[in-house]
Amino acid sequence: MPKPSAAARARKIKLIIFDVDGVLTDGKIWIFPAPGGSGAQQSVLEKSAQRGGQGGFGLNSTSLIEAKGFHAHDGTAISLARLAGIKTGIITKRVSETVALRARDLKIDHVYQGIQDKASVFAQILEKDGITAAEAAFVGDDVIDLPAMRKCGLAIAVKNARPEVKAEAHWATSHAGGDGAARDAVEYILKAQGKWKKAVEEYIGERS
């Protein structure tokens, strides 16, 4: 039996999970010293540790501030996915208050930071939402994303993903990570489901 096409896979999607560094950002990480430490960063680290995650900075993480840049088009796409009834999530190896703030602003459903084993957390999210692996997409860029991508219904690689990731992806974006890749992924899925135009009109209506 032939394997389902990427479009056929996209029609089943109810959840989209994104990596952060290299997917929602261009992969660059800006780190600055924070005199006296950052209470907000400590809060994120403590919450992540409670879920089994580990901080990305080591023991002195609270004395650092991590900054990242996000593309506005990707933010709009995540809002469009929500309007279309598709849940979103992020699973990332690093821990950053910047990511927590961006996720809160975009009303992302699932936020997991400091995660080494992305496949296990991916499985937990599926169980929590009551959906199957075939109904979930994962957007990644590097080899740490492969275990989760191998378990999802639609594995998406960003344009500048590592060759190993592209080789196993069902579909690749036309834009690089941090430069509209998430927008490509959401648009592809919503158009496959015939939900794109309605979501766009609802988005415009919310802001009229």
Q: What are the language-model segments listed below?
A:
Residues 17, 85, 107, 130:
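Conserved functional loop/turn residues at catalytic and ligand-binding sites
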Residues 19-21, 27, 94, 141, ...:
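Fold-independent oxyanion-binding glycine-rich loops
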Residues 76-102, 112-113, 149:
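Substrate-recognition element of Asp-dependent hydrolases with the DxDx(T/V) motif
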Residues 35, 64, 71, 110, ...:
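Mg2+-dependent phosphoryl-transfer enzymes with acidic/Ser/Thr/Gly-rich catalytic loops
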Residues 4-7, 102, 130, 163:
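A general structural signal for stabilizing positions within well-ordered secondary structure
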Residues 1-84:
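Active-site neighborhood of HAD-like aspartate-dependent phosphohydrolases
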Residues 94-95, 103, 116-117, 160, ...:
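Short beta->alpha linker loops
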